[in-house]
């Protein structure tokens, strides 16, 4: 039976993706919720594989957004603003990407620019699963996002929504969200600044009355990631980069 999964925020941790890829069958579908690049050493390789893999539905994250924003300037020798990308872990990506021919870099930029900001999956239980990188406050309608001109920034950068309640409107009664972007320790402590715990007992976090699930385990710091079954939101598989953990696996 075909399965549908979601994972997110692998940040160049290729060994984790390799495990996920081998775990999933050829006929499965994998929603990747953004942030393949930056911080870790193999972000470019990971992005290329995700774009090529027919099982993967790739959704843009804020780090893909930063890449497509700054790389065109870097190719022209303009380094204004580059420090912002570096602060967000972009140096490893640029050092790797700059080794490729410019034609291929431009091709990759075009492919990343095409990535959607969100997707909706109706699972086998009839639940409507809204998938995006950062998650969002569903109390805002799409039209309100358009009027504010911030739809893309909200869907890939927003963290304020973690304080919002699920909409009471009848049309949202069967809607759920799965997202990444905010590492679970941040969300648990209601911190909007980087905060990472050790990976012991670090798991995907269901919150907002069970309507939202955060699957970002901060894998660059914890070497642990989550793969959630979108047809059974209680079924989450965890993967570890044992090499990064020094051979020690955490529960």
Please place each PLM-identified region on the residue numbering.
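Acidic, His/Gly-rich catalytic cores of divalent-metal-dependent hydrolytic chemistry
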Residues: 164-251
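N-terminal active-site segment of His-dependent metallophosphoesterases
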Residues: 1-49
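Active-site environment of divalent metal-dependent phosphoester hydrolases
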Residues: 11-15, 38-41, 65-68, 138-139, ...
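Divalent metal-coordination and catalytic microenvironments
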Residues: 9, 35, 50, 61-62, ...
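Catalytic phosphate/metal-binding cores of nucleic-acid and nucleotide-processing enzymes, i.e., regions
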Residues: 6-7, 14-18, 75-78, 100, ...
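His/acidic metal-ligating clusters that form di-metal
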Residues: 104-189
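Active-site-proximal beta-strand elements of phosphoester/diester hydrolases
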Residues: 3-11, 128-135, 213-215
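Active-site neighborhood of divalent metal-dependent phosphoester bond hydrolases
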Residues: 43-47, 51-121, 125-127, 164
